UniProtKB/Swiss-Prot annotation:
Tissues expressing the protein: Expressed by the venom gland.
An annotated GO cellular component: extracellular region
The name this protein goes by in its record: Peptide Ctri9677
Keywords: Amidation, Antimicrobial, Antiviral protein, Cleavage on pair of basic residues, Secreted, Signal
A GO biological process held by the record: regulation of defense response to virus
Origin organism lineage: Eukaryota, Metazoa, Ecdysozoa, Arthropoda, Chelicerata
More info: Shows a low ability to inhibit hepatitis C virus (HCV) infection in Huh7.5.1 cells.
Modification type Leucine amide: residues: 36
Coiled-coil zones: none
Pro-peptide region(s): 40-64
Family statement: Belongs to the non-disulfide-bridged peptide (NDBP) superfamily. Short antimicrobial peptide (group 4) family.
Location relative to the cell: Secreted
Native species: Chaerilus tricostatus (Scorpion)
Amino acid sequence: MKNNTILFTFLIVFLIASQIEAINWDILIDTIKDKLGKRSEDREFFDFFTDDNLAALEKALKEY
């Protein structure tokens, strides 16, 4: 029963997110890059955002 609830919740969230067309992915990418340059205490969290990974993420989001 719990798995069905999780799947149903994921489905609803996915359907809502797929309808959002006004997301400006460039602003999202710039925000992530800005976080990389500032706040050294958050650096560990953003360590996986290397330039290659950011480029791949940006490409994937634009293709979406």
